Design a protein with these regions (language model features):
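Loop/helix patches that line or flank the sugar-binding groove of alpha-linked glycan CAZymes
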Residues: 373-376, 387-514, 520-525, 559
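Acidic/aromatic-lined carbohydrate-recognition and catalytic surfaces
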Residues: 59-250, 261, 268, 272-320
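Conserved alpha/beta catalytic core and glycan-binding cleft of carbohydrate-active enzymes
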Residues: 177-178, 183-184, 188-214, 291-435
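Bacterial N-terminal signal peptides
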Residues: 34-43
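Beta-strand-rich binding/interaction modules
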Residues: 524-547
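Active-site groove signature of glycoside hydrolases
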Residues: 253-278, 367, 372-379
Length: 568
């Protein structure tokens, strides 16, 4: 949702140094003749570090870097953001106890901002008996492992000073079985006589959950020492809340007000597909209720919901009127982005998918904001899906960060962290900051059976390597921030320039348009812009694997394998 206010934020791009690619050609392309390649090398400086528009500030040079200048970036003051998902326990430890905390996140805001992220999603921070904290024991507090409510308030203030939106996980589908509400209800049930009915006036908390004398299905678990069962879809330690109850809603409204007052800019609604199983109408009503309540507290409030389903179901949930749903159609090893990055999904099909989302989602909510992502805390890492192929990992990141809406990047994706196996603990490993400095290093979650998973080096190593995955992400995020049309523009397929190997999409926001051209194959592609009516546009920026520039001869651009070109 566009706002009129604008805030300035200068972000630094990565510095590229040439490095030869590793991939072997695997797809058809119209290749430039040798003499043309030589001409482009001479005229366009093919292989040199790319350049951005000039500002007064020039980056300092380190060993192996090339001097370059940067364009000042103006971030629109709206809910289109580049989000960084953080599992606090595994991110950065500020006090030496080997558990990440809120102050650790605050200490890494320079890094997060420098990367080009303009939003942060914190996985649950509320008190909980488990390491992941999706089973809450107090909706109005911070888990002592992570810090205090004042630590959160300061973090929110620090984010606001940097124009970074801070959202938190809001798991309202269930509580912990150790929550005082559930404990009180179970104690009451244990005192009932055989056959005696529940009296909610005697114990209001008995109405907060779904209790039954019958074990209605496998998701119902016995209340010890009673004839009663309770619903817990995920497991027995997470009893489902009865979200139909007004008393429950009043409790959750108190929680929402608490976090908004502390400085949260939005909520990620966990497990929204399961508020009531197979009841889209009820679930969307719950989302609408919570969103409307939060908007009363903060007119700029943002909400993104977890609807782990396909495009058509996600479209139905946009009928709630809430702004964003995670786009699971794009995510995970078999999602469209990773498949395209490894050459198993055509460039044209990817553009067709963009148009399809736009049509389906906007029909339900004209102010929709897509929430694309590659992976999250419940999925394997992108590097695993791509068998640690550095070029493919970069390409996947480039595709994600040129999608419309608000992309979400899971911490560690920017350095190619890995997480083999099916255990959730293995997907939430300690952030790999340095090989030589243990400061801030956390322990892996208890139960994880593998150590740090990265074939590409730590943050420290990759920062000094201009062609690293990290610096590729920095360039991609910077390109996104320099061109607000990428996130906000209405998409139109450039039919004449859409093939299996390459494709172009036009993005229009207000009176400004850009074109995004993708070459997802391993081979160079010669693309005649005139065929798509784009010949009047100039190259605005590019993403290439090793810092190559995209050459242009009259109306023809020569795109290296696995590259993205922005035209304006």
């Amino acid at each position: 949702m566009e706002k009129s206010g604008m805030k300035k934020q200068v972000l630094r791009p990565g510095i590229k140094k040439p490095e030869s690619g590793r991939r072997i050609g695997s797809g058809p392309a119209r290749l430039l003749p040798v003499f043309c390649i030589i001409l482009l090398l001479a005229v366009c400086g093919y292989g040199a570090a790319d350049t951005a528009a000039q500002t007064e500030e020039t980056l300092s040079r380190e060993e192996g870097e090339t001097e370059r200048t940067e364009r000042e970036i103006v971030i629109p003051d709206d809910n289109y953001r580049n989000y960084y998902e953080i599992f606090v326990a595994s991110f950065y430890d500020s006090d030496g106890d080997k558990t990440g905390d809120l102050n650790g996140v605050a200490q890494k805001l320079d890094y997060i901002q420098d990367m080009g992220f303009t939003g942060i999603w914190l996985m649950p921070v509320m008190p909980s008996p488990t390491y992941h904290k999706y089973d809450v024991t107090d909706y109005c507090g911070v888990d002592e492992e992570y810090g205090t409510t004042e630590d959160f308030r300061r973090l929110a203030e620090d984010c606001r000073e940097r124009n970074i939106r801070l959202i938190i996980d809001m798991p309202i589908n269930h509580t912990s079985s150790e929550h005082p509400w559930f404990q009180a209800a179970c104690e009451y049930l244990a005192g009932l006589e055989a056959g005696e009915e529940i009296d909610e006036e005697a114990c209001p908390y008995a109405g907060y959950y779904h209790f039954s004398r019958e074990q209605e299905n496998e998701t119902y678990h016995p209340v010890p020492g009673t004839e009663w069962y309770y619903e817990g879809v995920f497991w027995s330690g997470m009893p489902d809340l009865n979200l139909e109850k007004e008393a429950v809603r009043r409790e959750l409204e108190k929680a929402a007000s608490f976090w908004i007052e502390l400085g949260a800019d939005g909520f990620r609604m966990d497990a929204a597909l399961h508020y009531e199983e197979n009841d889209t109408a009820f679930n969307t009503e719950v989302l609408r209720w919570m969103y409307d309540y939060c908007l009363q507290q903060n007119p700029d409030f943002y909400m993104v919901s977890e609807i782990w389903a396909g495009e058509k179901t996600i479209a139905d949930y946009y009928g709630s009127g809430t702004p964003s749903m995670f786009n699971f159609d794009l995510a995970d090893a078999e999602g469209k982005l990773i498949k395209a990055a490894r050459g198993k999904y055509s460039a044209e099909s990817l553009v067709d998918a963009m148009i399809s989302y736009q049509e389906d989602f906007s029909a339900r909510n004209p102010e929709w904001i897509d929430a694309p992502f590659l992976t999250n805390h419940d999925m394997g890492r992108t590097a695993n899906a791509l068998i640690s192929d550095e070029n493919d990992v970069k390409m996947a990141g480039g595709l994600l960060l040129t999608m419309g809406g608000s992309p979400f990047v899971y911490y560690g994706e920017e350095i190619g962290m890995r997480s083999r196996g099916t255990k959730d603990e293995n997907k939430r490993l300690s952030m790999y900051w340095s090989d030589t400095d243990e400061t801030g290093r956390t322990l892996d979650p208890t139960g994880a059976d593998e150590g740090i998973g990265s074939a590409f080096g730590s943050v420290e190593e990759q920062l000094s390597d201009g062609t690293s995955i990290l610096n590729y992400y920095r360039r991609a995020l910077r390109l996104r921030n320099e061109n607000p049309e990428i996130a906000r523009g209405t998409a139109r397929k450039v039919e004449a320039l859409c093939k299996e190997q390459y494709a172009a999409v036009l993005k229009t926001w207000g009176d400004s348009s850009i074109a995004i051209v993708y070459n997802i194959s391993d081979e160079e592609a010669e693309i005649d812009l005139k065929e798509g009516g784009l010949e009047e546009m100039e190259i605005r920026g590019s993403l290439t694997l090793n810092g190559e520039e995209i050459g242009r001869t009259q109306d023809v651009i020569c795109m290296p394998g696995q590259s993205v070109c922005i035209l304006k």
